[in-house]
Amino acid sequence: VCQKDLWTGSVGYGYDGTANEHHVSVVYDDWTRDGNYLFTSEAVEDGYIILGTETLIVNPAHLGTTGYSSTAILSMNDNGQGLLGIDGIFAGNDMDAGTCGPPASNLTCNKTPMFKLTDNYGQSWAGNHAAFDFYYVPDAVFDDIFESWPNNVVIDNCTGATEDLCGYWSWYEFDMRVDNEGNPHIVISLLAETQSSLLTISGKTGFYHLTIDRDMLGNDHDDNP
């Protein structure tokens, strides 16, 4: 029986010019055990990378219904500042049943980007302690975006039938990076959602770029991007 099945991976790399050291971090999705596992380099010499012991960096117990959260991705700069993130839902959110309870209901019941930050090449990670050590994009940010969206959309061009918008959906095509100052940058897709379908709205739905100064992040949800 296969006990480990490391599958989709993402690599973060940084070079410490002062110490002349290469730093490599890699995170994998595990299909056998679920969750995402992080490895950081203990040494990089002569083209060989010696990775340390795995760390469960994204615990599936902290996420909602299986299959609705992405695998983790990594980004690192040469200052040792990095980001590890997913686009997902918090535990308590049952997408199949259409219910949302604690802890998700105390955070967000929407699918949202969530991430952790490092300043030491992935040796340790920090986030919002109240959200399983993830910073996340709160509902208020999306509410600001949706203020310019229409309240209803045409769902049948032949009959002119309309439906009210009841929310949004984000597909699995997304990206997260840190810049040279270690500030997080997030690109996600947003589609309009009605009771019966997911729709595009010209000039409204599509890909959105979100960012925040890392120094503005705190341990409570009001300080998230």
Residue ranges and their predicted role:
Residues V1-P225:
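Extracellular, repeat-based ectodomains that mediate carbohydrate processing or recognition
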